[in-house]
Amino acid sequence: MKLLVGTLRLWEVGRQVAFSSLTPGQECSGLRKTFWAAMRAVRTRADHQKLGHCVTMGRIMRPDDANVAGNVHGGTILKMIEEAGAIISTRHCNSQNGERCVAALARVERTDFLSPMCIGEVAHVSAEITYTSKHSVEVQVHVMSENILTGTKKLTNKATLWYVPLSLKNVDKVLEVPPIVYLRQEQEEEGRKRYEAQKLERMETKWRNGDIVQPVLNPEPNTVSYSQSSLIHLVGPSDCTLHGFVHGGVTMKLMDEVAGIVAARHCKTNIVTASVDAINFHDKIRKGCVITISGRMTFTSNKSMEIEVLVDADPVVDNSQKRYRAASAFFTYVSLNQEGKPMPVPQLVPETEDEKKRFEEGKGRYLQMKAKRQGHTEPQP
């Protein structure tokens, strides 16, 4: 009976899609073609979900999800994005018989905060596997906010995440990923290009971010030293997966908090996360480690601030391992006036040669992203 009901529902959806796309002058042959094309589209979506390539999760935003301005904390959104990605990638990597594994977050591509999310709204997070290599999974995530009083929905975030499957028997062993079926050959080729690009950038970033932020006494306003900040956090069980390693989303939220402190100290106004450049996870963080999350201003444009955030882990209960770099990223913040509109920020004053070099590198990233946005903007009539 359930199979019959499901078949009838599938037929009805296909019929409605087909008839909604017809024009009055179409003939029966056109009707048949449109109907069966719609049926194939519906079945493709259903099969895609059945195979486990999509997952959707949602929850209402509570007061404890808010930042000081009253909107949903950017770190909370990043954490939800990572949770959805971890679910779908771990499920996929265990979809075939073999050694069991857990998917570990390796990298988050640039994430833009397109629209603020408010307390009381429902966050809908949808994740889809879009590419698999031999040892990694690409997951694309979309975040929608819904006002349940008015029914209004809007897109707030888009992100791309990369995961690697680690064996439950030996977490240092990376397992092979079951391949996915692509609808078009072009999809696989485009995914392979994205994979090679992120792999190269991850290797370059790991060696570039080698220095540690050092505190300076009595710094001058608007300098790097004036606003640089750090948080020290002891990793506990609530921060970790069932296997004793820190959730990537926990690390990202702490990174966002430090970046927000740096931005607020620099401009002394309300600030919000505008975007996050690629977050690279260089190494795993175990339960019991003490992590130091350090942030420093690297560049300012007229209305935006770029903050570099570094995460260093110290295995205090393991004398055999030294302090190491666990993650790094660049966050972009904007300053808001009382009406919630972007306003100019104080210009950063780099003092040392390293600070001047980082400023020029940040300027290059800013101009590159600005040109990319302008290139995607459609000309107005």
From Swiss-Prot:
GO MF annotation list? carboxylic ester hydrolase activity; identical protein binding; long-chain fatty acyl-CoA hydrolase activity
Q: Which InterPro entries match?
A: Cytosol_ACT, HOTDOG_ACOT, HotDog_dom_sf, Thioestr_dom
Induction behaviour: Up-Regulated in activated macrophages.
State the tissue distribution: Widely expressed with highest levels in brain. High levels also found in thymus, large intestine and testis. Negligible in muscle and adipose tissue. In the central and peripheral nervous systems, displays a predominantly neuronal localization with highest expression in cell bodies and neurites.
Quote the catalytic activity from the record.
Answer: hexadecanoyl-CoA + H2O = hexadecanoate + CoA + H(+); dodecanoyl-CoA + H2O = dodecanoate + CoA + H(+); tetradecanoyl-CoA + H2O = tetradecanoate + CoA + H(+); decanoyl-CoA + H2O = decanoate + CoA + H(+)
N6-acetyllysine, modified sites? K169, K199, K284
Give the region (Disordered) as residue ranges.
342-381
Which intervals hold domain HotDog ACOT-type? 51-169, 225-339
Q: Name one GO biological process term.
A: fatty acid catabolic process
Q: What is its EC number?
A: 3.1.2.2
Which class of enzymes does this protein belong to? hydrolase
Q: Which cysteine-cysteine pairs are annotated as disulfide bonds in the entry?
A: none
UniProt xrefs under SUPFAM superfamilies: Thioesterase/thiol ester dehydrase-isomerase
GO annotation, cellular component aspect = cytoplasm; cytosol; mitochondrial matrix; neuron projection; neuronal cell body
What residues form the catalytic site here? N67, D256
One Pfam match: 4HBT
Q: Where is the composition biased (Basic and acidic residues)?
A: 354-364
Give the consequence of mutating N67A: Dramatic reduction in catalytic activity
Q: Annotated pathway, please? A: Lipid metabolism; fatty acid metabolism
Q: How does it assemble?
A: Homohexamer.
* Domain remarks in the Swiss-Prot or TrEMBL record: Both HotDog ACOT-type hydrolase domains are required for efficient activity.
- This chain belongs to the protein called Cytosolic acyl coenzyme A thioester hydrolase
Q: Which organism is it from?
A: Mus musculus (Mouse)
